[in-house]
Each structure stands twice: as structure tokens, then as C-alpha cells.
Amino acid sequence: MRAFFTGYCTAFIRQDAPAIAKHFADMVHVTSDDERDVSVQIASAAEWRKIIDRLLDMYRAIDVGSVEAIGLATDALSPRLVQARLRWALTDKASRQLYEFDAMYTLARHTEKFRIIAIAHNELPEYRKCLARIKTEQRSPQ
């Protein structure tokens, strides 16, 4: 699992949407907590690719330079089904911490490779706080 998430993380650092998308199954169940509500959606590969593109746009808006998994725990439910919990840390291109968030993944191996079939995360509130902080800093005189 560590190698899988290292490749996943590297794809995010490179902002390589096709490489990120290759880590996901053809259908993905996504659950997001945005502090106001919990949204649940099922996305096809094409829909998920559009979401990845929007996420990368969000990362560019806050100048993400690095994404690091600072915590990883896994539970193998079977040889073909694994759950993973990760703590992610994002820094900007000047190596300043932006924010951290948690995500839980369910991965399935239908062939020789695992693919993410479900993800639950709490990233959106952390992103919004970070974006607001950056906008405030940009408006404040130095």
C-alpha cells in the first residue's frame, strides 16, 4: 500500500491528472464532509476526471508545491480488498505548511493492480480556511 500511495502522492505533486485518475476504479464512491453537510456521490471515470481537474485548479490557487502522506494505516479485509486511512499535509512552493486533512480509502484489486473504489475525506473545510487565510494575507499590507 505504501508504494501505491507514493505513486498517488507523486501524481498530485506533478499535478498529473491522468496519472492521478489511473489510481481509481471505473466507478468511485465519494463522501465529503464540508462542515455544513455530508455529500455522497458516485462518479464514473469521466466524471471523476473532471473532479480531479477541479481539485488541481484549487491546488494551483493556493500554490501547492508538495503533498505528503504523514500518516498511513491499513487494514486488509481480504487479499483483494484493503482499507487505508491517510493523514495528508500540503505545503506551498516556498515549503510553508498550508493545511492537513484526513482521508479514508477502500481499494480493490480486480486484476494485478489495486484501484481506489471509495474515498471519504474532510479536506474541503481545511482548504476553505487556507484559501481565506491566503486572501487575507494578500490584502494585508506587508
Stretches with model-predicted labels:
Residues 27-29, 85-91:
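Generic short beta-strand segments
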Residues 8, 20-21, 48, 84, ...:
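Hydrophobic pocket/interface hotspot
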Residues 98-137:
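Short beta-strand edge/turn micro-motifs at domain boundaries
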Residues 69-74, 87-90, 102-108:
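Hydrophobic/aromatic beta-strand elements that line small-molecule binding cavities or substrate pockets
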Residues 18-72, 80:
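A solvent-exposed, acidic/Ser-Thr-rich amphipathic alpha-helical stretch
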Residues 1-16, 23:
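Short, aromatic-enriched amphipathic alpha-helices that serve as compact interaction elements
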